[in-house]
Amino acid sequence: MSENLKDEILEKYIPKTKKTRSGHIVIKTEETPNPEIVANTRTVPGIITARGCAYAGCKGVVMGPIKDMVHITHGPIGCSFYTWGGRRFKSKPENGTGLNFNEYVFSTDMQESDIVFGGVNKLKDAIHEAYEMFHPAAIGVYATCPVGLIGDDILAVAATASKEIGIPVHAFSCEGYKGVSQSAGHHIANNTVMTDIIGKGNKEQKKYSINVLGEYNIGGDAWEMDRVLEKIGYHVNATLTGDATYEKVQNADKADLNLVQCHRSINYIAEMMETKYGIPWIKCNFIGVDGIVETLRDMAKCFDDPELTKRTEEVIAEEIAAIQDDLDYFKEKLQGKTACLYVGGSRSHTYMNMLKSFGVDSLVAGFEFAHRDDYEGREVIPTIKIDADSKNIPEITVTPDEQKYRVVIPEDKVEELKKAGVPLSSYGGMMKEMHDGTILIDDMNHHDMEVVLEKLKPDMFFAGIKEKFVIQKGGVLSKQLHSYDYNGPYAGFRGVVNFGHELVNGIYTPAWKMITPPWKKASSESKVVVGGEA
């Protein structure tokens, strides 16, 4: 069935496109348990892709959630709107009185005259006006495609403005065309955060201090994660970047362990912080009970404190006991259902684990903007070829900080933890947790998706806003996991309950029986088309 499905997906493509897309579709089998997949390459022109741009990844994903910064988009107003609140990264004023600008959108609103004569003066004025009106902790300036094409020097403008107004002004050359997807923007943001922000704070380090990286507080996820972590006794030093303040990001070097939730968007910072400050990192998963429990136990092993380990087990027992009836109900209602997932660069994997605990079988999974290591595991990184698009992103080199580098976990203990299965500086990728016969599709487009829907008839299909309504017109439940359809949180123990109830309610709604999928309707080929009779 899997091979037939791949053939049917590729059948409609012209030969050149068929050859290109073939490598993006692989099947896990007993003979090839970790097949090489083509990822992080350009989308074929003309294909309806779900990907975003480098600007969206930089401003919209990584930097945008920092709530006391003013984020100025230097470009047309449409780019600003695209990254304004649509992802639902929640935030609230720090301690009830702090700054929170996430309800605002800031743009230089470039017009045709700015493209012809340059937008530098407009950007200077915008920075000064934003400072005088809001007095933020810092300002970010984000370049869009037109800015790169006309050559506005945003780095020089930011440097000059910073001296004039007395606060940090960071410029990000994240023009949309800088990479093949939003992943390029993540990398650009990571580089600047690492070189210009982290390590600039002066707070004292606290006991059991941790950072949560790649968590953006969609629907309040970070708050639920904080509740559990603080209940155990951890100090959540900084979350990058959901509900974050600029100061907390500055003090991210004051931690003993980094937890990486979204591997794709922030693994660069995790690696660089380990090199520069000696802070180890583990891949975590706070989506689904099994993932949460495994993560909490891995954390306790890293700290190796009997009291912390004891408290970890107590909290796990308390939290599971509180939701056990719900878990039993979800399994009763969802056992044997099937799902497909096509989300982001990590979420397909994290949610697959939660679905498995409900008894839901994942048939197809893929990522929008992943790299090969997100599919196959970090062990393949040395074999990944650097192409011309990747070279658009400046590589930075970090070295151990002479004053701040420290050995948090001795090397012999690191090896011991790795042998015990703790994912220190490691991520195994999604493929390893998929069963034989499942299909992986990278950069899935609407055609691929419609074939999957028609042939596999899954009970649910998790995707983004661009795909959601196409799926539901096919009579299949779709939840979009980029912004949670106005719901959430889905992380943490309480998040499992929220997600489970929404799935059960969605699956058993009678609305799906009232929808006729497009492929079951009479063909329109013989009807009136543009230009007259067919």
UniProtKB/Swiss-Prot annotation:
Transmembrane segments: none annotated. Its cofactor is [8Fe-7S] cluster; [7Fe-Mo-9S-C-homocitryl] cluster. [7Fe-Mo-9S-C-homocitryl] cluster binds at residues 262, 482. It is an enzyme of class 1 (oxidoreductase). Its EC number is 1.18.6.1. It holds the Pfam family Oxidored_nitro. GO terms for molecular function: ATP binding; iron-sulfur cluster binding; metal ion binding; nitrogenase activity. One of its GO terms (biological process) is nitrogen fixation. GO terms for cellular component: molybdenum-iron nitrogenase complex. This molybdenum-iron protein is part of the nitrogenase complex that catalyzes the key enzymatic reactions in nitrogen fixation. This is Nitrogenase molybdenum-iron protein alpha chain. The gene is nifD.
